[in-house]
């Protein structure tokens, strides 16, 4: 994750809505607020004493949005979220023919084309499913709508752990019968058949966009491992190409077969969740160790051919699925081997050590070396570090960490960004090793209530407005500034710009689109905005 020292984790602060709103109003004379349309519902805010608020949802009410609004040519839509409590509030303004502003100018460069976006989403862990299903059915539906429907933030990616992970309440794999090398006893437990699979189907039914499923394994069955345990330092027995590696590769196909029987098809699998974890003595939860050389040979001799020769040959294979600190070295080892490289579609990265790994030296260099291998951010959450509180209800800082990471990733060729647990309880679990963390949605089953945190809306500023197939384009600033910004073009040619202000200062701002003119606006302190406009 982007580095946040203990001092940056905010202490409880009183909300200062009036001052922020006043500051933003002075610079927004051209913008006209749009009243909540018939389908949209405003946030019911609640403060838990941190820097911002959560939005409260229950069985009968949850804030919602209309589908993204593209106004007539010559005007723009602006969606605003602020620390003071605004949540993706819509306003509109005219696009000016001439530049009258004196502040920062951001110029769109549509001829500079970069990566096409796959999408945004989160993980349907056992813990997430348990929390969602602990709500009453009407509240469950409102939570799923919040993530996946047009009146929510339009997620189009769901990551699915293959069997248990730390966010499970027990340890299991799909083939726990010892020495079952033919996997005759492979079966999905109730965590899949009663929890995850029904919820994934409900999410797909609610989604207006096609949703892509991504699977990741944490551990193999223990009888395939050198240490005979789900956790701790251990890897597959034997060598790539042998019965242990072949069995583990066929386990992937059996998983895809089993989900296909439940009418679920996967877009991609990762070769292993955090393969470096299983190289560490005493690692506390499910893992399976691979060095880059071991992963290279496993992909080349076992996993790649096994997938390619199965009915799931269209399922993409992503390597690494670990900290970007391991790049570009890990990519060099795997992708300079033509036998491994031919099976690898992309490189998945996690955010937890990003503060040690500058994006340019890792993502940027990897893209330079392997421009045809896509980069995909597959996991992120806050609250996992020893100095961090697990859950901070209403933390604006944590929302900013998310959006800063997303913008940074987009600027360095990453095609998608996936959050970790879709929902957790107020403790940040359940988690069988008590590795509690935060989540964009926190479920309080005692009140049949769930809380949508600032992280949820920060993610929504991207997921709702950047559909699959959108392409990042150039955006150049006229001077040094404290804003984070990224520009993209929708498949239909319309434009979207996301601007994040992590500072306390309001920043007058003009966005120039050579095709249509100038968008005069302001970026208030501690705010995030998404701008949309038609170009033809």
Swiss-Prot record:
Reported effect, residue 296 to Q: In GD1 and GD2; also found in a patient with Parkinson disease
Effect of residue 416 to S: In GD1 and GD3
Effect of residue 87 to Q: In GD1; decreased glucosylceramidase activity; 20% of normal activity
Signal sequence residues: 1-39
Effect of residue 405 to R: In GD1; loss of glucosylceramide catabolic process
Effect of residue 251 to H: In GD; uncertain significance
Effect of residue 495 to P: In GD1; loss of glucosylceramidase activity
Name by which UniProt lists this protein: Lysosomal acid glucosylceramidase
Organism: Homo sapiens
